[in-house]
Structure formats: C-alpha cells, structure tokens
C-alpha cells in the first residue's frame, strides 16, 4: 500500500509535461486493451462461423441450397460463406451469358472470390495497425517524458548550493514513472499484435484453401445445368 501511495505521490509531484505524457499513455493503454478485447471476440466469431459453414459445405448440401442460405443469412454470414456467395453469384452470371469456354467462367468466379477474400481480410485485420503503433511508439513517448522530467529535475537543482542523492532521486523517480507507463502500454499491445497476426494468417490460409477447392468444384460443374457435384 505504501508503495502504491509513493507512486501516486510521484505522479502528483511530476511536472505538467510529464503528467500530460502519463495521462496520454494511460489513455492509449485503455484504448489498446479495448481493441484487444474486441479483436479476441471478433476472431473467435470469425473462426466459429467459418468452421460452421465449412462443415455444412462438405456435408453434401447442394451448392444452390448453400447459396440460398447465404443470401438469406447475409447479415450474419462469416467470411468463408460470403466468399462462397460471391463466387457462386459470378459463376451463375457468366453461365447465363452462355460462354463456351468454361475456363473463363471459372476464372471469373475465382477473381470474384479473391476480391471478396481481400475485403474480408481487410476487415479481420482492422485495429492491428493501431496495436502495432502503440507497441512501437509508447516506449518512446514514455522516454520523452522521462528525459523531460530529468531535465526539469536538474533545472530545479541549479539554485541549490549542495546537491545530494536524496535531493536528486525524487525528481528522477518521477521521470522514470513515465517510462514504466510507456512499457505498460506497449508490452500487451506487442504480445496481442503478434498473437492476432498468427491467428489471422491461419484464417487467411484456410480461406485461400477453400477458394482453390471451390474453384476445382466449379471447374467440374462448369458444363452442368445445376452445379452440385463435389
């Protein structure tokens, strides 16, 4: 408890600039934790929706039934289901034009799925750049507060005739709190960023694999009246 109070006292006695730096870093830390929690829940939902659709896709349900379900459930569909829907939509549009070259039809569907994939990946990666910025910049902001605080402490000692460690230590300690808060903001952001980046890479690989598998299915069904074969 005494240690907590001493830290509070250090913050209260710090210069205005150092206090502003501390307040900024604390605000950034709160925003960072909010972004981390949102990303945890959103990635969990993305994985769950992708797994659910993938099970349904390989269960034997016809492609037309899957497309109808995707259109009906558009607001709540996951990335994989939306990619599937965009591919099926483009596939059917090109087939209606009675294009003889089936490769052109499949390539068009694949391009539509790749475009949808990029949109989904951009959405999943949202807030990652913020976490990266917090992790890389916060320590330097804290260091700026520390340097400023030390300069302020030594400036205040200029008028003293005798300077001892007991005289200098409080000012330096006040300044070092800024660096500590900067690290407190940066470390969770860096750890979360690395974890999310790995998880998103796995999601991206899974979606790309699905695009290739579905493209092969469309290739086999390009000449059929009602594509359904796996």
Tell what function each PLM region has.
Residues 48-141, 150-164, 191-230:
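Predominantly long cytosolic amphipathic alpha-helical stalk/bundle segments
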Residues 161, 167-175:
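Hydrophobic alpha-helical transmembrane segments and adjacent short intramembrane/lumenal linkers
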Residues 15, 33, 66, 84, ...:
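Residue-level signature of catalytic and energy-coupling elements of molecular machines
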Residues 9, 132, 145:
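A cross-family signal for key residues in well-ordered alpha-helices
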Residues 26-46, 143, 150, 185-200:
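Alpha-helical transmembrane segments
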């Amino acid at each position: 408890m005494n240690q907590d109070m001493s830290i509070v006292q250090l913050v209260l006695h710090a210069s205005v600039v150092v206090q502003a730096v501390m307040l900024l870093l604390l605000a950034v830390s709160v925003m960072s934790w909010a972004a981390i929690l949102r990303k945890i829940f959103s990635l969990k939902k993305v994985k769950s929706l992708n797994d659910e659709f993938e099970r349904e896709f390989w269960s034997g349900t016809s492609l037309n039934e899957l497309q109808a379900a995707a259109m009906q459930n558009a607001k709540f569909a996951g990335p994989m289901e939306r990619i599937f829907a965009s591919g099926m939509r483009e596939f059917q549009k090109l087939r209606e034009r009675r294009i003889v070259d089936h490769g052109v039809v499949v390539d068009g569907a694949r391009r539509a799925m790749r475009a949808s994939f990029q949109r989904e990946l951009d959405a999943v990666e949202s807030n990652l750049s913020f976490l990266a910025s917090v992790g890389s910049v916060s320590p330097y902001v804290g260091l700026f507060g520390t340097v400023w605080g030390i300069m302020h402490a030594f400036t205040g000692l200029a008028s003293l005739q005798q300077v001892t460690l007991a005289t200098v230590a409080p000012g330096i300690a006040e300044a070092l709190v800024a660096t500590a808060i900067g690290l407190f903001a940066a470390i969770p952001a860096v750890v979360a960023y690395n974890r999310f980046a790995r998880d998103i890479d796995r999601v991206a690989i899974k979606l790309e694999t699905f695009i290739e598998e579905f493209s092969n299915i469309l290739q086999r069904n390009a000449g059929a009246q009602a594509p359904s074969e796996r």
